[in-house]
Amino acid sequence: MFATRSFCLSSSLFRPAAQLLRPAGRSTLRNVWRRSIATEHLTQTEANSRLASQRVHRPNSPHLTIYEPQLTWYLSSLHRITGCVVAGTLYAFAMGYLVAPLAGYSLDTATISGLIQQVPTWIKVPAKFVISYPLTFHIFNGIRHLIWDTTKELSLKGVYRTGYAVLALSVLTSGYFAMI
């Protein structure tokens, strides 16, 4: 009630509208800085050189080298890389399987097992590890992501714990597959 009463008794309400607008209009128009717009016609090379000189003075964004590498970076990039490697290998083998008969080659299981039997064991074991590691890592890290989708293990400690578990399980299962 008091706020309404003091508002009604304000002296500015009793002035005519022309008096209220006149002083404000005069002072703001006097203080406005007017600048004419200058344009110039540039050739393409002049425009490119001006743009290049402006780019020199722009601030650079931070590079990845200023950040401390973390396990989560490595596992995320390795998950993407192994996904591409596994999918690329699958597609390459499928295309080879389809195109081989057209080129006069046989790419059936008997031929592949015959070729693998000719390879010495000291080459087969590391080769099987190298072949199986991307697949096992991608599978276990995919399971890790599915666990995260259930909102479990999302703490910093849980993320690192599951990351080390994925690495250990991938190495162990790849080693097992290499020894078979």
UniProtKB/Swiss-Prot annotation:
Source taxon at top rank: Eukaryota
Residue spans, topological domain Mitochondrial intermembrane: 104-122
Protein residues bound to heme: 138
CDD domains on file: SQR_TypeC_SdhC
GO cellular component: mitochondrial inner membrane; mitochondrion; respiratory chain complex II (succinate dehydrogenase)
Topological region Mitochondrial matrix: 1-82, 144-159
Membrane topology reported for the UniProt record: Multi-pass membrane protein
Pathway: Carbohydrate metabolism; tricarboxylic acid cycle
GO MF annotation: an example: protein-membrane adaptor activity
GO BP, one annotated term: tricarboxylic acid cycle
Alphabetized Pfam families for the sequence: Sdh_cyt
Membrane-crossing segments per the record: 83-103, 123-143, 160-180
Compartments it resides in: Mitochondrion inner membrane
Required cofactor(s): heme
Keyword field: Electron transport, Heme, Iron, Membrane, Metal-binding, Mitochondrion, Mitochondrion inner membrane, Transit peptide, Transmembrane, Transmembrane helix, Transport, Tricarboxylic acid cycle
Cofactor note: The heme is bound between the two transmembrane subunits.
Similarity comment: Belongs to the cytochrome b560 family.
Function noted in UniProt: Membrane-anchoring subunit of succinate dehydrogenase (SDH) that is involved in complex II of the mitochondrial electron transport chain and is responsible for transferring electrons from succinate to ubiquinone (coenzyme Q).
Subunit organization: Forms part of complex II containing four subunits: a 70 kDa flavoprotein (FP), a 27 kDa iron-sulfur protein (IP), a cytochrome B and a membrane-anchoring protein.
Protein name, as recorded: Succinate dehydrogenase cytochrome B subunit, mitochondrial
Organism annotation: Schizosaccharomyces pombe (strain 972 / ATCC 24843) (Fission yeast)
